[in-house]
């Protein structure tokens, strides 16, 4: 049971979760140090674990018609912040925590759609959540291998962060409009 839901959680990120992948890419781009990245990823993880559990167990219900456009807006917002802020700021993990709450509602909706075994809700929830985390770690590791070597370069912001964040913002806004239609 655990492994089945772990796999489903991983697949919700890779290959099915382009929106969540872009959000994680946005976090990575603005994090030129490991501590900055860890603060943000930890805030995101804690937040989405909370709302994933609340949504999956039926304690909280927010319709996908509200959650999905807001997730897209969160992607655009984190990318725009990457364009505006030149350095890591203490409020960034708080913002990421708030956005993580939204993403957790999205994960919860996906998990509810898959169905939960009544006798193993906690095992399924834990497996799915850890699968999501493993997917995010895979994305971050891939990014570290691809561009981590140049994060300290003087041209990194101009040549990597700005164009990639601009593209992510455009995609996030497009998805928001598409999900509202």
Tell what function each PLM region has.
Residues 1-181:
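Membrane metalloprotein/metal-transporter helix-bundle signature
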